Amino acid sequence: MSSLTILLQRACLRFALLPVPPLRAPLRPPRRPLGLPRRSAMSSSAASRLSHIVAAAGGAAGESSEPPAAAAAASGLAQEDDDLSSAMMGYRLPPKEIQDIVDAPPLPVLSFSPSKDKILFLKRRALPPLSDLAKPEEKLAGVRIDGYSNTRSRMSFYTGIGIHKLMDDGTLGPEKVVHGYPEGARINFVTWSQDGRHLSFSVRVDEEDNTSGKLRLWIADVESGEARPLFKSPEIYLNAIFDSFVWVNNSTLLVCTIPLSRGAPPQKPSVPSGPKIQSNETSNVVQVRTFQDLLKDEYDADLFDYYATSQLVLASFDGTVKPIGPPAVYTSIDPSPDDKYLMISSIHRPYSYIVPCGRFPKKVELWTVDGEFIRELCDLPLAEDIPIATSSVRKGKRSIYWRPDKPAMLYWVETQDGGDAKVEVSPRDIVYMENAEPINGEQPEILHKLDLRYAGTSWCDESLALVYESWYKTRKTRTWVISPDKKDVSPRILFDRSSEDVYSDPGSPMLRRTAMGTYVIAKVKKQDENTYILLNGMGATPEGNVPFLDLFDINTGSKERIWQSDKEKYYETVVALMSDKTDGELPLEKLKILTSKESKTENTQYYLQIWPEKKQVQITDFPHPYPQLASLYKEMIRYQRKDGVQLTATLYLPPGYDPSQDGPLPCLVWSYPGEFKSKDAAGQVRGSPNEFPGIGATSPLLWLARGFAILSGPTIPIIGEGDEEANDRYVEQLVTSAEAAAEEVVRRGVAHPDKIAVGGHSYGAFMTANLLAHAPHLFCCGIARSGAYNRTLTPFGFQNEDRTLWEATNTYVEMSPFMSANKIKKPILLIHGEQDNNSGTLTMQSDRFFNALKGHGALSRLVILPFESHGYSARESIMHVLWETDRWLQKYCLSGSSKTDSDSVADTENKTVSASGGGAPCEGPEAEGFSSMQRSLL
C-alpha cells in the first residue's frame, strides 16, 4: 500500500496564491500519519498541517549592499524596453533577484517505511518546461488525459529515489540509491510493501519526439536498491487514469492495465451522425455549477471509454500474471485489511454532458482476492440532480470503506433527506456496517444516526470510535463517542462547537499502524486503568498558533498537555507517531513522535521527540532556500475595521529596511476573502508569527527582493450573522476590510499611501477587480490572476454562495466587477491560463472583462498563458507572469504613473497580450477533476 510522504517545501503552497484556509472541525477526522496507506481509520479528508504529505510530487544570490527600496528604484525597468511593442513580444524573464529565488533547486520529499526505520528521499526537478504542457491532451468528463501515456496529463514526477536507514538515535545512515531503471525516467506512485522490504513505482520515459511514454510498473528491493520491471512482457502497461495499483500482500500487486486487445483509439466522424440533443421533457429540476472539460458528444464518450477502461491483473514477483474480472472503467481498487476481499468501484453508462465523471453511474462490487464476484454493494444512478445547496450529497450509499480494526467489515452512510440540504428531516444521515459476507441473510447494522451531515469516522477498536457530523450553513460541528460492538453503551457527544471557533479546537486523534497495515486511533497506557488517546492540535490563540499534544481521557474529558510548541522563536508541529511497531496500547514512557520545527529565518527541519526524557534529535538539515532573503522582517499584525471586527495580516518587509531612515515603501497587498457566520470568529487569529516565510514560484513575497512591503493574507471577512446572507453585503464589507488594511500599513509608516497595489488569484482576483471598482482611493493598481468577474455566467452558485442567480439577482449583479467596469479607472493587469480547468473561472471571464474595461477606456492589460490551467506550472509561463507583474508594479505603483489620465493611455495600453507573442486570447474549455484524487498523485 502507498505510504504518504512529506513535501518539505511547504512554502511552495503556503504563500503561493492560496485562499484563507478552511475552518476546521473541532475534532476533525485525524491527520493521516506518515506511511499511512489507503486503508485509513478515517473516511473523509481533513484539513491538516500535513496538506503537503503526498506520494507523487511536482516537480544563490548575494544580498545587495543598497537599501532595498533604493536598489529596486535603481533597477527600475532595466530588464524591459518600455516601448510597448517590446512588451508585446514573446516570453520574458523577471529581474535576476526574482529569478534566483524561483530557480532555487527544490527540496526532496520524504516518505517513511511502515515500520518507521527507513526514509525515502524522493528527488524532484525544478519547474517543468512549457513543452511538457504542450503535449496533446484529451479533455473528457472532467479529466485531462495524456493519450500517449494513458494517465492524467501534466502529471509531475520524481527523478530519483534515495533510501536512508533511520538509526535509533535519530541519525540517518548513508544513502542507498535505487538503481536499474532507464536514465531520464519519470517516476510516480512510489509505495511501500506492507513489510517495508520492497518499493513499487511507475516508470515512464519520453520518446525522442517528446511524446509521453507509457507507464511500466517496477519494483525495487529496499536492502540492495536494485529495481526491475514487475512484468516480463514489454506489452503490459499501466492505466493510471484513475487508480493504478495496490499491494494485496507482500509479493503480489493488483494492477490496472491497458487491455491488450484495445486497438487504436476511435476516430472522430468527419460528418456527424445527427444533432447534439439534450432533453428535459420530464421537467426535472437540474441545477449544476459551471463544470469544465465535460463530454460533448458520443465520440467523446467513446474516447473516454477507450482511455479509462482497464483490465485488472494480479501480478506476483515470480512473473505470474492473472487477469481478473472483465475490462471496465475501474475507479478504485481496495483490498480488505485481511487481504481476502477486494472492493471494486467502477463507473458506467449512461454518461452525462452536464456533470463530470464523479457523478456518472457508479457500481461498487465485492470480489474475492482472486477476482471471483461475491455480491454487488450498490449501483448508483447518474447524479445530475444533486442540489447546489451546500451540504447536499448524492443519494444512496456513499463513503463505503473497510473498517480498519476488523479483518473484513464494511461501513458506509446513507442520506435520509434525498441528498437535499434544504429538506428538514431527522435523522439526516445513517451510518451502517456489515460483514463482507453476511451470514444467514443478516441485515446491515445501524452504527449511528446523525442530524447533521456525516463527516467521517475515526476507528479504534470494538469499544471506541469517533463519528463526526457538521452543517456548513450554521458552522455547527459535533464529535460523537460510540462503542461499535457494545450495544449496551449509548453514544454520547464529545464535542459540540462552531467550526469557525478555532480557539476551541481540541485537536485530532493521532493514529497508529496495525499489524494489518491499517491505521486506527492510538490508545496510550499510563499507570492507571483509564483510556487515553492523543489529541494533536494547532493551538490557535490570540497571539497565534501554538501547536500541542494532549493526553486525553476519553471517559472523563480530562487532559494533560504532554508537549507544546515553543512560543518565543519557533513554530513546531507534531507530524506523526513513530512508536507504533506493535499492536495494543502504547506505553507513555515509550512514546516517540516526529515533529517539525521552523522559525521566521530558519527553514523547516524534522526531529524525533523521545519519551520519557522528551529528548529531541534532529533528522534533517536542509539549507535556507533563498539566503538573500534570510533577514527579511515578518510580523503578524492586528487592526480593526470600522464596524469593530478585528482583522489580522502578516506584514513582510525587505532585508535591511529601516522605516526611520528609508521612509515608506511601495506595498503589495495580496489576499482572498472568506465567509463567516460571526464577528467573533472572523476576528480570531489564524497562523503563527514564527512560521517560516515560504516563497512559492508565483508568491507575492518575491517582491521583497524588489524592495516592496508585502501585506500577505489580510483577513477580508464577509460576515452573515443569523439568517443574513453574507454576500448581500459583500461589497460593503470588502471595502471596509481593505480600508482598514491600507490605513494600518500607512499608519505604521511602512507603506506610501499613493503606492499600495492589490492582487489576488481566483476569488482573490475577483476581490481585486471589485476593490478597484468600489475603492479606487485605496490602491494605485491591481493584479488579477485567473479570476471570474461576471457572476451571471455562474448562475447556479459560486464559491460558498448556494443561491441561484434568479433567487439573488441583485447580489449576483452587485458582486460582479464586470457590471462595474465603467467605474474602474486604476490600472489593472489580468492574467489567465488559456486552458483553465477550474469550475467557474473560464478563460472567457478575463477575455470579456478586458473587453468591457477596454470599452470604457480603462488602463488595462490582458495576458493569456498558452497551455496553462487554473494554476501556472511551466517555467516559461511563471517567469513571464512574474515579468508582467513586476513591470506593472514598477510602472504603476513604484513610479506612481497610475495617476495619469487613463483616457490618454487607453489606446496604447489596453492591448491583449498572449505570452506566446501577442496572439488572441483563447476561451478556456470547461473542466472538473474527478471527485477523488488518485493514490500517490499530487
Swiss-Prot record:
It is found in: Plastid, Chloroplast stroma. GO terms for molecular function: serine-type endopeptidase activity. The keyword Hydrolase applies. Its EC number is 3.4.21.-. Residues 58-77, 897-938 are annotated as: Disordered. Residues 58-76 have a biased composition (Low complexity). It is an enzyme of class 3 (hydrolase). It holds the Pfam family Peptidase_S9. GO terms for biological process: proteolysis. The active site is at residues 762, 836, 870. GO terms for cellular component: chloroplast stroma. Residues 1-54 form a transit peptide. Belongs to the peptidase S9D family. Serine-type protease active in vitro against the LHCII N-terminal. Cleaves its substrate on the carboxy-side of Glu residues. This is Probable glutamyl endopeptidase, chloroplastic. It comes from Oryza sativa subsp. japonica.
